Design a protein with these regions (language model features):
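N-terminal pre-domain/capping segments
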Residues: 1-68
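Hydrophobic faces of well-ordered beta-strands that scaffold small-molecule active sites
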Residues: 1-7, 20-27, 41-47, 74-78, ...
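Active-site-proximal loop/turn and secondary-structure-junction residues that shape catalytic pockets
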Residues: 9, 29-31, 49-51, 80-84, ...
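Flexible, charged surface loops at secondary-structure boundaries
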Residues: 16-21, 36-39, 69-70, 116-118, ...
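Gly/Pro-rich active-site loop or hairpin
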Residues: 54-55, 93-104, 168-232, 240-241, ...
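Active-site acidic/histidine proton-transfer and metal-coordination neighborhood
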Residues: 58-157, 167, 254
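A short secondary-structure junction signal
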Residues: 134-137, 162-163, 169-172, 203
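C-terminal helical cap(s) of enzyme catalytic domains, especially alpha/beta-barrels
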Residues: 246-276
Length: 276
């Protein structure tokens, strides 16, 4: 398993100065940024594709394939993220069988378009965070049974965003251990992780790692070590980034302190797994 870190100017300076060690920068699928990042360090591209809103058919298939091959990223990810503003006539927290059936059909169709182009073995489906926000992510797409069903029916792999799973479990009022136990963790191909803070009455991720977050990561690593969950190719620390949405959460002090702690955990897990 490798370690990636969100690309940011602060992260670049720390990598170039030798203050932190990572295996990959994680970047969005922006051509200019990938060119900039690959000149400095290996890159794992994270695609901005979404399933559930009927937009997959509009993507540039050649561009997706080109960026995947250019960076050597082994998987093409898609976010399972139908949003209420695409379905204004249903409530964001709907659990109606008719609504679930309707939206699931769109999610399945979107993912299968990717499967038809690239093959199921190449596609990984990421779980989104649900917070019950009007216009935003629908609750039904974070239900573990829905995620599991989609993975099984499409044959795709699972991109487990640990922080998203924790946040979603809190907002749907399900015990977090129970939530994880219902996810298709035997199909994990990649994982994402970041700190979760309570800000303005909401649980927000992509922040510095707190004590409670470390405990969750260690618990996840134990599941992998015990062979209960499959081993991902990559763990991405989703701290920092490009633009105004991230400029307030790119503290060099956080990166220089927490990345080595993550890297050591990844190395320790790799050593334990290779000794089995």
């Amino acid at each position: 398993m490798f370690l990636a870190l969100n690309y940011s100017p602060q992260a670049v300076r720390l990598v170039q100065s030798g203050q932190i060690k990572i295996d990959f920068f994680k970047t969005p699928d922006w051509d200019w940024l990938i060119r900039q990042a690959t000149a400095i360090h290996p890159v794992a591209v994270h695609f901005t594709l979404e399933a559930g809103n009927g937009s997959i058919s509009q993507i540039d298939w050649k561009q997706v394939d080109r960026l995947s091959q250019l960076t050597g990223t082994p998987y093409i990810n898609v976010h399972l993220d139908p949003r209420q503003h695409h379905y204004p006539e249903i409530s964001v927290d709907t659990q109606s069988d008719a609504d679930v059936k309707r939206v699931y059909r769109v999610m399945l169709t979107d993912v299968m378009q990717l499967v038809d182009h690239f093959g199921a073995e190449k596609i990984i489906v990421e779980n989104s965070p649900y917070r019950g926000e009007p216009g935003n992510t629908l609750r039904l797409c974070v239900e573990p049974e829905i995620i599991t069903r989609l993975i099984e029916e499409t044959g795709c792999g699972f991109l487990l965003d640990i922080s998203h799973a924790i946040i979603s479990s809190r907002y749907i009022d399900m015990d977090t251990y129970e939530y994880f136990s219902r996810l298709p963790t035997h199909t994990i191909r990649e994982m994402h992780f970041a700190g979760i803070h309570r800000l303005n009455g909401q649980w927000i991720d992509h922040l510095s790692i707190l004590k409670a977050d470390w405990r969750w990561l260690d618990w996840v690593f134990m599941r992998i070590h015990m062979g209960e969950w499959s081993q991902p190719w990559l763990l991405a620390f989703e701290y920092g980034g490009i633009g105004t949405a991230f400029e307030w959460r790119c503290a060099p002090g956080v990166i220089v302190k927490q990345v080595p702690m993550l890297y050591q955990r990844v190395c320790d897990l790799n050593s334990r797994l290779s000794a089995v």
